[in-house]
Amino acid sequence: MQLAVNIAVLASIYALICCGYVLIYRVSRVLSLAHGELMMLGAYGLYATASLFSGHPLLAVAAAGGLALAVGAAVYAALMWRMTGESVLAAVLATIALGILLRGLMVLVFGTQTQYPLRDLGWTNASFDVGGGARISAVGAALVLGTALVYGSLFAFLRGTRWGLRMRAAGQNPLLAAQRGVRLHGIYALAWALATFTGGMAGMLLASDAGLEGTLVTIGLKAFPAALVGGLDSLLGALVGSLIVAGAEVLLIHYVDPLLSDVVPFLVLLAMLVLRPWGLFGSREELDRV
């Protein structure tokens, strides 16, 4: 039972992170390799707002979420809109450069010391029994529930709202969407804002659980194989891919060797590239581009 809980928590972490990879790629066909740094920036945003709004934890969390949305839109407005119409390689290199810049700025501003935003908020990470002898921490439960809420909201948004339909149209046929009056730059900025928000949310929860330090970026990198396994243009694929990668990682750590933790996601990815290169829910048309 404890293994099942561990898989659910780790799958929620990966799903919440790779949701951003999928959103950006699905809408703008850009592969963002700065997502780990944007995730960590969201965590540092919570650390900053926790100090700024001391004694008001809910206000600090809301401010950190709003800051993540603003940062995502600003990244598109300041950099990524210039990549519209450029080659895939140029856009990917731009996100790599962005990630390096953000990592350096975060070290410069916040230093390298481990921070604990949950303590600054005045909250504790108590654990409780879920039956069968298994336990889950408060942050772990928040991760599972938060991921379910995010994906449910995104599915409803993309299928049932005007802006969601515009995002789908822009992703499927941007030229036709533009001819129909869809403002592509606004849609792309929204995709970056939502992706940074979900990534920042993952970063905030991870920092609340284990502390905030530079190695948080590597978790964002480990979530990338989950997005590829599921298919880069599918939110459902992101969920399934995250569950597969998390299940393999937890089981191999438990039964084989804990040192395999950083290797397992990429072993799963290699196996998927051999068996089904376009991912479980991806399409053959995306294979050449990926």
Question: Which residues fall in each region the model found?
Answer:
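Membrane-interfacial amphipathic/re-entrant helices at transmembrane-helix boundaries
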Residues: 1-18, 45, 53-60, 86-91, ...
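Helix-loop-helix "hairpin" substructures at the membrane interface of multi-pass membrane proteins
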Residues: 10, 131-212, 235-240
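Single transmembrane alpha-helix segments in multi-pass membrane proteins
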Residues: 2-51, 78-90, 229-235
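Transmembrane helix-bundle core of multi-pass membrane transporters
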Residues: 82-83, 88-160, 187-190, 256, ...
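Cytosolic-side transmembrane-helix boundaries in multi-pass membrane proteins
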Residues: 109, 172-179, 183-186, 256-290
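Alpha-helical transmembrane segments within multi-pass membrane transporters and channels
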Residues: 21, 54-98, 105, 240-245, ...
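Pore- or pathway-lining transmembrane helices of multi-pass membrane proteins that form conduits
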Residues: 37-41, 83-107, 216-228, 257-276
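Transmembrane alpha-helical segments in multi-pass inner-membrane proteins
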Residues: 14, 18-20, 54-66, 192-199, ...
